[in-house]
Regions:
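Short pre-catalytic strand/loop immediately N-terminal to key active-site residues, enriched for Gly-Thr
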Residues: 97-107, 328-332
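Metal-dependent amide/peptide-bond hydrolase catalytic core
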Residues: 1, 173-177, 184, 190-348
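Acidic/His- and Gly-rich active-site-bordering loop/insert found
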Residues: 2-102, 124-130
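Residue-level recognition of beta-strand->loop/alpha-helix junctions
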Residues: 45, 138, 299-301
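Fold-level recognition of mixed alpha/beta catalytic cores in primary-metabolism enzymes, strongest
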Residues: 111-222
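Single conserved hydrophobic/aromatic residue that forms the stacking wall/gate
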Residues: 347-356
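A structural signal for isolated positions on well-ordered beta-strands in alpha/beta enzyme cores
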Residues: 42, 71, 135-137, 296
């Protein structure tokens, strides 16, 4: 069995310029590393039937055939590095500076993958025979559209009747120090684009036109003032943010025919995406009708909110983290969405939690 150093492995992973949707060889490399440890690896490539997204490589690897199956979920894709000149090092040529590993994906989340693989290698050297199974679910589509990634792997596993009993999503989680926090849930996310249609005209003759901007401003004001809820013991209050307003009108003396606004809602488990769609549509419909404008709303749901109630296994993980780090992690649902949303909605898993 090979000796796997987590820092060395993290550096090797960072060298792959796997900016979504490009894999750049990262998944095949991981498969080779896991096979050396005895894992049965399956590379799964998915593509969108409508060809709106590019094919994505994923991997599901398992060691053992019995339950319980402890799964580590993560992703090898990274966000674009931006201008290379703005980096102190080449983002895909990792370097250590002042005790920090610098490179694209060092934090989110190639180092996490490397650490878990290294931990598994050390565990297997001590206990080659153990009760249950260890598995990895790694995608190359988390930072992008997330269409051909974890969700489709989970669907594949359901078809194969492959059961995951406990899943750790290794995303960066702690605000300051390792061991501070365990994510036991996440808020949902829904984005929307509101189009308001009036009638074009000259500003000198406003009575001959219908300004959609006025209607859109009133809608944005109403949405901004509307309090969705006060939160609960597990979640902070749901929040709606107007993210853009656009008229596409360069003439200062012309009343435009249409106006557009975009928004995003991060919502807790007091709502569903369906209930929020109805609420938003109702507000837009009432104000549009009042001003005799037509409207159109397009919604995109990134994920529903979910909560895993702390059980015996999660409390055990908390105790282990405290023993190793000397810090008692808090249970939290703060922050953005993650692929835990895809795992949590299946019958594959009991709890879904998130630890780094």
């Amino acid at each position: 069995m090979p000796n796997i150093n987590e820092l060395t492995l993290a550096k090797e992973l960072i060298k792959f310029p796997s900016v979504t949707p490009k894999d750049a060889g990262a998944i095949v490399f991981l498969s080779k590393q896991l096979k050396k440890l005895g894992f049965n690896c399956k590379i799964l490539e998915f593509k969108d039937k409508n060809k709106k997204s590019k094919p994505i490589k994923n991997i599901y690897a398992r060691l053992g055939k019995k339950s319980p199956n402890l799964c580590y979920a993560g992703h090898t894709d990274v966000v674009p590095p931006g201008r290379i000149e703005d980096w102190t090092v080449n983002p895909f040529k990792p370097s250590i500076k002042k005790g920090h590993l610098i490179g694209r994906g060092a934090n989110d989340m190639k180092s996490s993958i490397a650490c878990f693989i290294s931990a598994v290698e050390k565990f297997l050297k001590k206990r080659r025979k153990f009760k249950g199974s260890i598995s990895f679910l790694i995608t190359g589509d988390e930072e992008g559209l997330a269409i051909n990634g974890t969700k489709k792997v989970v669907d594949y596993l359901k078809e194969k009747k492959e059961k995951i009993d406990f899943c750790i999503v290794g995303e960066p989680t702690n605000p300051n120090k390792l061991g501070e926090m365990i994510k036991i849930g996440r808020r949902g996310s829904i984005s929307g684009t509101i189009m308001i249609y009036g009638s074009q005209g000259h500003v000198a003759y406003p009575h001959l036109s219908n300004n959609p901007v006025n209607t859109l401003v009133n809608i944005c004001k109403k949405l901004n003032e509307h309090k969705l809820d006060k939160g609960n013991k597990n979640f902070q209050p749901s929040n709606l943010e107007i993210t853009s307003v656009n008229v596409d009108n360069t003439a200062t003396n012309v009343i435009p025919a249409s106006a557009r606004a975009q928004f995003n809602i991060r919502f807790n488990n007091l709502h569903t995406s369906s209930s929020l769609k109805k609420k938003i549509t109702s507000i837009v419909k009432i104000l549009s009708k009042k001003n005799k404008c037509k409207f159109k709303i397009d919604f995109h749901v990134s994920g529903e909110s979910f909560l895993t109630k702390p059980n015996k296994t999660i409390h055990m993980a908390r105790s282990i983290i405290k023993k190793v780090t000397k810090i008692t992690p808090v249970f939290s649902t703060t922050g953005g969405t993650s692929d835990a949303r895809s795992v949590s909605y299946t019958h594959l898993t009991l709890p879904t939690k998130r630890i780094v």
